[in-house]
């Protein structure tokens, strides 16, 4: 059984719901999912021991939430090179944050990223069955790459 960390922040609760549903998908695929708010992670040592990392942030003003920017500086110190990664987030008008996080994980952290790329979900779809199922599918797809 592989262990996946889902680290996120959320202002309205939508990205948190996405994190929970992605974790459900990971568990459905037979792996362990641990969910943490990024504000609870205080050191790079807390990022060790996982096989994959899925980071989530809502998009505000075409960018990730400020706490995610701070977290990425911490995560860079954790030396996640070669680990599997993914990124997700909710949005109202534009969904740029997950792609920015994804690119940082790929090009700065040198992580192996999920084949699906980053995952965006319009806030209005987070509370409907199809949206939550899409989140579960994203979690399952990450597990397919974990083996």
Spans of features found by a protein language model:
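Short secondary-structure boundary/capping elements
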Residues: 39-42, 66-67
């Amino acid at each position: 059984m592989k262990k996946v960390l889902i680290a996120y922040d959320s202002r309205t609760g939508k990205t948190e719901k996405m994190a929970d549903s992605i974790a459900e998908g990971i568990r459905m695929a037979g792996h362990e999912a641990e969910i943490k708010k990024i504000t609870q992670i205080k050191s790079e040592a807390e990022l060790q021991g996982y096989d994959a990392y899925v980071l989530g942030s809502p998009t505000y003003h075409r960018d990730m939430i400020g706490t995610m920017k701070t977290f990425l500086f911490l995560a860079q110190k954790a030396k996640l090179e070669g680990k599997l990664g993914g990124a997700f987030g909710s949005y109202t008008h534009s969904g740029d944050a997950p792609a920015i996080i994804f690119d940082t994980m790929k090009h700065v952290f040198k992580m192996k990223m999920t084949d699906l790329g980053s995952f965006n979900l319009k806030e209005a779809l987070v509370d409907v069955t199809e949206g939550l199922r899409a989140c579960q599918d994203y979690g399952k797809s990450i597990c397919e790459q974990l083996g």
